[in-house]
Amino acid sequence: MNMESVLHNFATVLIYVEFIFGNLSNGFIVLSNFLDWVIKQKLSLIDKILLTLAISRITLIWEIYAWFKSLYDPSSFLIGIEFQIIYFSWVLSSHFSLWLATTLSVFYLLRIANCSWQIFLYLKWRLKQLIVGMLLGSLVFLLGNLMQSMLEERFYQYGRNTSVNTMSNDLAMWTELIFFNMAMFSVIPFTLALISFLLLIFSLWKHLQKMQLISRRHRDPSTKAHMNALRIMVSFLLLYTMHFLSLLISWIAQKHQSELADIIGMITELMYPSVHSCILILGNSKLKQTSLCMLRHLRCRLKGENITIAYSNQITSFCVFCVANKSMR
């Protein structure tokens, strides 16, 4: 077994690990917020954003997995209606995953940052309406993306040779469509997320200057909130940039028919919907407490320890308490 074969097998295993990890982390966010909704019959604004973001990312992860499977059997993938379903599902999941993450960045900015600008105070007062307006406005870009994708897909299908020998070109063409559409329609939301990140840094800088004037040595809750939000936002910006560049890598790899490079591109691409969701869990007090509770319960089960009914009820009550507790408002 040569070195390339070893790297290929290792990369394949890594893709499956990311696939499972991404489904578990996003599925946990969905389940946690669903239980919260069942208990309280309502969800806060940030919980709604996290819930829909996790659902869109689960779909995106499965789309990437379908693309990965097509490398081993291309002839069973890009055929007629299957191409349309996979392609347009990718467009939808990628669109909502990006815009929901952007609205999350805007949410953190307006809820945490301390600014005296009139426009900032106005947007902060109408935060819910702003988030809804951003998502409704994003539908205009989604419509334009779908219309352009339909025209490109019809043109592509019209001139396409359905023989198996051209399937590698089909995959390269499909990646090219996704890459350039993604580049065109992700500029605005990515810019908004970047601006939110920079403004939050500016707010943190002003806050730290204020703390120095009153000689506080320990980090106050506002500083901790700033740092937590910045970690979430910078991880999103970096991972989405890697996600975008991975499509470029995959496109170049398929042009040169390099399966190993294509798989490496997919590994990088899966990091965005998988790893960032884990960072969201660690940065959200409610989700973090619930996850620790579940891990503690799972560890006891795996060790084969005898859990009494009282102790089991105690764990269950604690989990319900964690779910019922709201995170950042």
From Swiss-Prot:
GO terms for cellular component: membrane. The keyword Nucleotide-binding does not apply. Pfam families: TAS2R. Glycans are attached at residue 161. CDD domains: 7tm_TAS2R13 (cd15026). InterPro entries: TAS2R. Residues 31-47, 109-129, 203-231, 284-329 are cytoplasmic. Several bitter taste receptors are expressed in a single taste receptor cell. This is Taste receptor type 2 member 102.
